């Protein structure tokens, strides 16, 4: 069943990638970078789904604001104190139990698909170590917007192993670089 879900996910998620010229044209669950969460949810629903202090002082993150058949999870990031709730990040993905190799296979399929459709986007380097629990492959356009496809693997807690696809505005991506360093 998990494989079927993944293939449905791949087809539905990436069918609009091939025709998109910019990241804001890619839709995930109908939402896209630059759109407003208020187009889909009430302010109360947004606040209820927002996790406190994930990215202090700058951005807020909603968790599973919408039930979805395609993904195991979905998060949407917007700027703190933005009354329009402009979307700066969307992440979604599928959980993998304890076989990281399966995650890597699916990651490679997605990378190949993006590489064929987004020829003008370059990949960013990542220092890959054999024992790493996080393996991202990131595509960036000339404007700084990014698509990341990442495998997360934690042998001690298989409930959080996942293949994650993230769309990020330049502003959010730059913030993450500063925040994580």
Show which residues each predicted segment covers.
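Compositionally biased P/S/T/G-rich terminal and signal peptide-adjacent segments
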Residues: 60-86
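Non-cytosolic coordination micro-motifs
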Residues: 21-60, 64, 89-181
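Sec-dependent N-terminal signal peptides
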Residues: 4-16
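Hydrophobic alpha-helical context, especially transmembrane and signal-peptide helices
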Residues: 11, 21, 25-26, 80, ...
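Short linear interaction motif-like sites in intrinsically disordered regions of transcription factors
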Residues: 15, 72, 119-122
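Generic marker of residues within folded, mature protein domains
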Residues: 7-10, 80, 129, 139-141
């Amino acid at each position: 069943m998990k494989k079927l879900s993944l293939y449905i996910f791949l087809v539905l998620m990436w069918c609009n990638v091939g025709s998109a010229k910019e990241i804001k044209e890619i839709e995930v669950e109908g939402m896209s970078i630059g759109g407003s969460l208020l187009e889909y949810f009430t302010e109360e629903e947004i606040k209820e789904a927002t996790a406190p202090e994930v990215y202090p002082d700058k951005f807020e993150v909603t968790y599973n604001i919408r039930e979805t058949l395609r993904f195991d999870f979905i998060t949407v990031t917007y700027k703190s104190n933005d009354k329009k709730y402009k979307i700066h990040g969307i992440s979604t993905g599928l959980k993998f139990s304890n076989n990281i190799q399966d995650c890597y296979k699916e990651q490679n399929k997605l990378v190949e698909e993006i590489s064929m459709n987004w020829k003008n986007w370059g990949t960013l380097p990542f220092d890959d170590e054999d024992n790493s629990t996080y393996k991202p492959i990131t595509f960036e356009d000339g404007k700084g917007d990014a698509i990341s496809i990442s495998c997360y693997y934690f042998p001690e807690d298989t409930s959080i192993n996942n293949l994650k696809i993230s769309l990020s505005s330049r502003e959010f991506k730059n913030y993450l670089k500063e925040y994580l360093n």
